[in-house]
Amino acid sequence: DPRVAAISVTTSNNVHLEIAEAAAAAGKHMYCEKPVGRNPTETAAFEACVRAAGVLSLVGYNYRWPPLVQHARALIAAGKLGDLTHYRGNFLVGYANNPDGVLSWRFQRELAGLGTLGDLMSHVIDMAHFLYGPIAQVVGNQHSFITDRPAVAPGTTTHFAVGYGNK
């Protein structure tokens, strides 16, 4: 439909790539919820189809836009906070902390892909990148503390550290 210039992909992760490929082939720009792929291969395929079609895409990192975050970014860019050497990010959410909770697509690896890392920690990583710049190195560990759900990445705690090549 030529009246449609852009689409919003807000489905379960397992169909993000399929929808993106169809939209790109039709010349439609897109906003896609994160993660755009369930694994690095799907993520690279998403980027490739968007680039090949010459359409614009935006990934749904909505925590970039509050005024406080914008102000912090401006202060950092202006050097008003000094030489930053450490970033500590937290993303606290309660929807997945009940072992008896409803089993949704987010807890099924074939549908969700990266589990907690893709669903929640990607916001923390994006915020570090958005505020400070490209990340050069990452060190991390994780532990699943709710193991009674079907094979997924349920109830995972993840810690990671990033290093910046420019500092």
Regions from the language model: what does each represent?
Residues 10-11, 131:
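Short, well-ordered coil/turn residues at beta-beta hairpins
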